[in-house]
Amino acid sequence: MGQKVHPFGFRLGYNKNWQSRWYSKKEYPAFVFEDHNIRKFVKKTLYHAGLAKIEIERAGGKVRLILSTARPGIVIGRKGVEIEKLRADLRKKFKREFAIEVNEIRRPEVESQLVAENIALQLERRVAFRRAMKRTVSMARKFGAEGIKVTCSGRLAGAEIARTEWYRDGRVPLQTLRADIDFGFAEARTTYGVIGVKVWIFKGELLDNEVA
């Protein structure tokens, strides 16, 4: 049975960049764990803001967060109130100084993490899984995705036996290194159990060493 390598790990250093950018000899394990906790905290705090990516950079004890979001207004707040509150909460919890940069995602329909979370939300609201998959696939294609593949795994429609269903439209060349493949994963917590949602979106081919 063929196994699939993670599309980001497969392309790291070639046309994908690391989402944590720093180096430390002595504190490496502590920083990795702290990065995980920072992402978890920010994701929980801004769960309604459509966060697709949280990048972390470190320099001289200061942490810089780069948040890619579909709703920058919610993250920043009126006159920057929300972003200041987030910075204060992070400083209090992690005892570090934080700088926060917010980038707007212009086309959330072709951002795989947001697409996966959208499908998961629909499943939690008891929308039929096939309808949720087909709706998001057609929307992604409409907004310029060259190909998209969606899989849902678990007790679909409340079935006794868990299974995996998938739907694909267009090309999704996972083994082509120069292909710009975006990958997202989300979980739908339904009354029957957890349903895993995976989304691969092919956005086109990149030139040699061009970073997506």
UniProtKB/Swiss-Prot annotation:
Tell me, which GO biological process terms does this entry list?
translation
Q: Which domain of life is it from?
A: Bacteria
Q: Which Gene3D superfamilies match?
A: 3.30.300.20, Ribosomal protein S3, C-terminal domain
GO MF = mRNA binding; rRNA binding; structural constituent of ribosome
Q: Which residues form a coiled coil?
A: none
A GO CC term attached to the entry: cytosolic small ribosomal subunit
Q: Which SMART domains match?
A: KH
Q: Glycosyltransferase among the record's keywords?
A: no
Q: What positions does the domain KH type-2 occupy?
A: 38-106
A Pfam match is: Ribosomal_S3_C
Q: Which UniProt keywords apply?
A: Ribonucleoprotein, Ribosomal protein, RNA-binding, rRNA-binding
What the protein does comes down to: Binds the lower part of the 30S subunit head. Binds mRNA in the 70S ribosome, positioning it for translation.
NCBIfam families this protein is in?
Answer: rpsC_bact
Quaternary state and interactors? Part of the 30S ribosomal subunit. Forms a tight complex with proteins S10 and S14.
- Family stated for the protein in its record: Belongs to the universal ribosomal protein uS3 family.
Name of the featured protein: Small ribosomal subunit protein uS3
Gene that specifies this protein: rpsC
